[in-house]
């Protein structure tokens, strides 16, 4: 390892302990997107945060009081927001990729890439109603 690489490499003993908490999507239509994620993936609103210029809906799987969350963030002034190009998909582990793909499409998602087999997994992509890419994954044993 070069001196420069050694100097910039993170030190395990000083790195903070972290856990993943949430992904936040800024959305155009908060009510519509809430309905989509409820119907397509069974998420429920665990908490609503009313801010001066926006509302946040903290969504989780039904019955979960803690853990990873999807936060939908809607501006109150209905400003124009769009999905940019510098992002990757939100990955969702599912039991049956084909069934989850069909269900999401039936609930308003756009098919983006039909289910296929990859090494050790089955994968498909859909776009939510505002164009965000969602990757559906089922690991094979």
Locate each region found by the language model.
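Vicinal oxygen chelate
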Residues: 1-16, 22, 46-48, 92, ...
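Core segments of cupin and vicinal oxygen chelate
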Residues: 17-18, 24-67
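Eukaryotic phosphotyrosine signaling hubs
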Residues: 20-21, 85-89
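Short amphipathic alpha-helices within nucleic acid-binding modules
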Residues: 33-36, 98-103
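Exposed loop/turn and edge beta-strand positions of beta-sandwich/beta-sheet ligand-binding modules
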Residues: 53, 86, 120
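Short, charged/polar, Gly/Pro-enriched secondary-structure boundary elements
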Residues: 64-69, 131-133
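Acetyl-CoA-dependent GNAT
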Residues: 73-77, 138-140
């Amino acid at each position: 390892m070069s001196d420069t690489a050694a100097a910039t490499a993170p030190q395990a003993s000083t790195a903070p302990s972290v856990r993943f908490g949430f992904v936040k999507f800024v959305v155009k239509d908060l009510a519509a997107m809430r309905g989509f994620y409820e119907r397509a993936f069974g998420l429920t609103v665990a908490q609503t945060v009313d801010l001066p210029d926006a509302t946040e809906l903290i969504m989780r799987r039904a019955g979960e009081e803690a853990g990873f969350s999807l936060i939908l963030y809607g501006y109150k002034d209905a400003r124009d927001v769009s999905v940019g190009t510098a992002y990757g998909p939100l990955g969702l582990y599912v039991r049956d990729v084909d069934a989850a793909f069909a269900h999401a499409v039936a609930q308003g998602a756009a098919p983006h890439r039909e289910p296929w087999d990859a090494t050790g997994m089955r994968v498909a992509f859909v776009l939510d109603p505002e164009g965000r890419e969602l990757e559906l994954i089922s690991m094979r044993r």
